[in-house]
Amino acid sequence: YIALPFWLRPAVVNHQTQADTKMTIAAFIGLGVMGYPMAGHLASAGLEVRVWNRSPDKARNWAEQHKGTASASIAEAVRGADIVIVCVGADPDLRAVFEGPDGILANAPSGALLVDHTTASAGIAEHLSKQAAGYGQHFIDAPVSGGQQGAENGQLTIMCGGEPEAFAKARPILAHYAKALNLMGPAGSGQKTKMVNQIAIAGLIQGLSEALHFAEQADLDVRKVVDVISKGAAQSWQMENRSGTMIDGQFEHGFAVDWMRKDLGIVLDEARRNGARLPVAALVDQFYGDVQDMGGNRWDTSSLIQRLRKK
């Protein structure tokens, strides 16, 4: 039996075994609500996982829980790694972890795969891809959709931008926490696809908020209304998963308003560059600003309905 390199092994989403990737060394940078469980899936799959987090205690806790390694620095984590996976906050955070003498680019080996799950601008993805190529590394922008629940359950949707060969190598690794995993085009294409996703979500949540608010004002049984219309053309993931909590005024079930505003800011910046007209997305961004003014910074995105209920 001759063991194939990990990138030549079959890649079937959510059907990997420990033997498929047991020799792969993965560095995971950023252990937030998404990164922590994602790194855990890699460890459970049998990869050698080294983690680094800005708060060292979280890295140590992760390493103890998952029998991995908590690295003292980014440089220590990425040296000799086959794949480096990043999940941080925004463009400035990406520059902080990738660039400089102690960053990923200067310390990851030539030939390494560099995968970024951060929702960021297409411009930073294109920039880091060019920088990585200068080091002989392969960068993939790979923002995700599915939220904390998707990360914990290994059921994320991942939208990738980069070289087909690099994507083929990364796919069997990323498959450990993905239900859908697609290459959308060259560097930056993953981020642009995530922008499309956020535009659609913004409109859906605003529409659902107005529908539920109207039903409330019309003295209808709102749950019965949802039960009926969810069986027709109005059905959506948001209706199925968020209508009940919206009716109950519970907004601790997902992606925070602060992060959605960050994402919509990226969307609107890109639209100014490419000439897309996004009147509804721009309005919803302002509406989320109203929610922030109400103290809802950490409420989930379905809290748009609260600004309609405000007397």
Which residues does each PLM region occupy?
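Rossmann-like NAD(P)(H) cofactor-binding subdomain of soluble oxidoreductases
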Residues: 74-79, 83-84, 91-156
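NAD(P)+-binding Rossmann beta1-loop-alpha1 motif at the extreme N-terminus of oxidoreductases
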Residues: 15-86, 117-118, 148
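Active-site-proximal catalytic alpha-helix in oxidoreductases
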Residues: 154-161, 182, 186-218, 229-241, ...
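Interdomain hinge/lid region at the active-site interface
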Residues: 191, 235-301, 308
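Rossmann-fold dinucleotide-binding core
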Residues: 26, 119-199
